[in-house]
Amino acid sequence: MDKTIDDIDFEKSGGLVPVIVQDANTKEVLTLAYSNRESLELAKKTRKSWFYSRSRNKLWMKGEESGNTQEIKEILVDCDSDAIIYLVEPSGPACHTGERVCFHNELK
C-alpha cells in the first residue's frame, strides 16, 4: 500500500519520526536519525537524506559538511506510519566519526 506524507504520524512522538538509513544494495543499517515533516518533504523532493537534529533543533542534510551524501533510492513507511526507512546509495562513511556505519560499538 502506498503512503503519502499526510499519512505519517508525526504527532505520536512530538513531531518527529525515526528514520532507519539502510544501504540500498547490501541492506546494511547505516544509521538512525529523525525527521520532521519538512525534512521528509525535502528528502522526497531532493532524493538526499534530510533529517531534523534534536540537539541543534534544525534541519540538516547528510553530507552537507563532510561531503558524504546519501542518494535516496526508495522511502519505505512502516505499518503504523510512524517510522521510515531510507534506502540509500552512500557516497562515503555514514558516521560522523568516519566509520562506515554508526552501529560499530558492541554492547558487552
Curated annotation (Swiss-Prot):
Signal peptide region: none
UniProt enzyme class: hydrolase
Cofactor(s), by name: Mg(2+); Zn(2+)
Keyword Amino-acid biosynthesis recorded: yes
Cofactor remark from the record: Binds 1 Mg(2+) ion per subunit.
Binding site for Mg(2+): D78, D80, D82
Keywords annotated in UniProt: Amino-acid biosynthesis, Cytoplasm, Histidine biosynthesis, Hydrolase, Magnesium, Metal-binding, Zinc
Protein name: Phosphoribosyl-AMP cyclohydrolase
Source organism (scientific name): Nitrosopumilus maritimus (strain SCM1)
